[in-house]
Amino acid sequence: MSDKRRYFGTDGVRGKVGQYPITPDFVLKLGWAAGRVLAKQGTRKVIIGKDTRISGYMLESALEAGLAAAGLKATFTGPMPTPAVAYLTQTFRAEAGIVISASHNPYYDNGIKFFSYEGAKLPDDIELAIEAELDKDIECVESAELGKASRMVDAAGRYIEFCKSTFPSKLSLSGLKLVVDCANGATYHIAPNVFRELGAEVIAMGVEPNGLNINDQVGATDVRALQKRVVEEHAHLGLAFDGDGDRIIMVDHLGNKVDGDQIAYIIARDALRRGELKGGVVGTLMTNLGMENGLKQLGIPFVRAAVGDRYVMEKLLEKGWKIGAENSGHVILLDKVTTGDAIVAGLQVLASVVGSEMTLHELAKGMTLYPQVLENVRFAGDNNPLEADAVKAAVSEVEAELGSKGRVLLRKSGTEPLIRVMVEGEDETLVKQSALKIAQAVKDNC
């Protein structure tokens, strides 16, 4: 079996709807191939959730047909955050969980990602086995062995109660005014209820999904509307989730953005204060130097993993630590959950706000963020602009100019045809100029 993936990226199979591989026929076959592999593992039962994209209906039906042909029973939750599917997969002792989502991407993209019976991303060998089955012709099991489908009517209530259970029982959100932005995505009927039931006054936005407006000028990837609303409403803070509920960005009462690095820092510092910190914190190559320095001042160990929440998870398991994060808002808290969970992460920050009697603004000031500029350059074809001499020369020039007071990172996105250019340093003007210089070199060689 080849160890090179053709379909699975860092977050499952993803692409533009209607273009291979996000087509009904391929997704049907993917369901069958996954069913063949998973049927050998155990219970022949899977939990399937989705976000609010209009294409979710089509892909859900295709998956159902493929899984049934392989003899698996599918239980559908309807719109449900990705971490909720991971949780329900565990509690129902299912063999796997499947989420139909393209996370923070626009509505015209979609994808399929899988969770193991432990609620974690599928191991590499299982993904490769599924890809091997995709090369075969579909063969249905005997008619008496065909799978059935059912609906889980209480999935939302189950997950809401789980989220609330991760918040300290002696604390309450009473007296807090929160603005909650659900990105017109999968958390729209979950997150506002979690915070309200814990006592907060909640102003909800991004809670009117129509199949096309997911992540559209709302949510964790665009917090401008949330920043404006928090200030207008004189709220204590705001929370923004992405389309599938595995990313969180927060906003303080002044309208300042608080990213995944700062969120992880606040959670780690609070755990240290309570004497409950287990090990250190895992970040990524994109993690701000300010977080690393801030943790160092507290005596908290820090290591970097490759970009992608699956690599953060791998490093956490390797080190035996419990807190990991990406600055984009993936926050993994292994003492609470098995995967990145935005609502649960937000609750831990709120516990710190209430428990310390400090504002989010005050808590976030504990670390100083270095100016960091990210430029995305779209490319097509098989060429690799990162190997171009002109790009390498531009990087070398910038690194020489930044010296020890900054860094440069270029990488291919694992989910989109993008080259990501990141420059970080003490001098914001120089950082911006440097990022544009490298991005232009990349564009010229695409």
UniProtKB/Swiss-Prot annotation:
Catalytic activity from the UniProt record: alpha-D-glucosamine 1-phosphate = D-glucosamine 6-phosphate
A biological process from GO: UDP-N-acetylglucosamine biosynthetic process
Top-level lineage group: Bacteria
PROSITE patterns the record matches: PGM_PMM
Isomerase keyword on record: yes
Active-site residues from the entry: 103
Modifications made to the protein after synthesis: Activated by phosphorylation.
Keywords, in A-Z order: Isomerase, Magnesium, Metal-binding, Phosphoprotein
Cofactor note: Binds 1 Mg(2+) ion per subunit.
Function: Catalyzes the conversion of glucosamine-6-phosphate to glucosamine-1-phosphate.
Protein name as annotated: Phosphoglucosamine mutase
Organism: Vibrio cholerae serotype O1 (strain ATCC 39541 / Classical Ogawa 395 / O395)
